[in-house]
Amino acid sequence: VLTKMVADITPAHDTKLQELLRLIADKIEHPINEGNRRVLVFSAFSDTAEYLYEHVSTYLKETYGCDTALITGSIDGRTTIAGFRATLNNVLTCFSPLSKGRDVLMPGSTADITVLIATDCISEGQNLQDCDYMVNYDIHWNPVRIIQRFGRIDRIGSRNACIQLVNFWPDLTLDDYINLKP
C-alpha cells in the first residue's frame, strides 16, 4: 500500500532536488569567481546524501561533463571518475587541489571533482577553500554545525574574492501540519 502511495514521487517531482539542480547549474554556468565551478553540498543524513549523489551526479555528468563525489563517513567514498580510488583523502584532494596539495600528493593527476556531496563527517578540520559555493541541503539541529560547515570554504588563504553560502530551510507549513505550537 505504501509503495503505491509513493510511486508517483519521483526525482522529477521532488521540488527541493530540482531547486538544488538549478542552483548548481546556475553556479556552473555563471561562476561567482572566474573559472571556479566547485560546489559543496552538506546533508545531515547519509541516506539523503546518497539520494542526492544518485541524481546530481548523473545530471552533472550528462549535462556538463562534471564529476561528482560522495563522502558520508559510513561507506567508502564514491565518484563518477572512472577507475578513481575514492578514499576520503583522494576525494578531498581532487575537490580542493590547491589547498590539499594535489600536485604533491598525487603527482601527474588531473582528476577534478566539481561537486562534493557530504555529511558532517567533513564539517570540521578540512580546508576546502578552493570551493566558493556551499549548500546546506538540510539544516542540522545544532547551529554550531552550520557554522562549522561554512568554515570549510570560508578560510584564510582562500583565493576566492567572495563566497556564497546557501541554506535550504524547512517548509514553515510543516509546523502547522504537525500541530507544533510556537
Model-derived regions: residue spans:
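SF2 helicase motor core recognition
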Residues: 102-111, 116-131, 151-158
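A short beta-strand-to-loop transition that corresponds to the Sensor-1 phosphate-sensing loop
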Residues: 43-46, 74, 118-122, 150, ...
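Conserved Helicase C-terminal RecA-like lobe
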Residues: 1-112
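A short acidic (Asp/Glu
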Residues: 49-55, 80, 129-130, 146-147, ...
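A short beta-strand element within the Helicase C-terminal
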Residues: 117, 126-139, 163-167
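Amphipathic, heptad-repeat alpha-helical coiled-coil/stalk segments that mediate oligomerization
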Residues: 84-95, 99, 110, 114, ...
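Generic structural signal for small/hydrophobic residues in well-ordered secondary structure
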Residues: 20, 41, 128, 149-151
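A conserved SF2-helicase RecA2
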Residues: 144-182
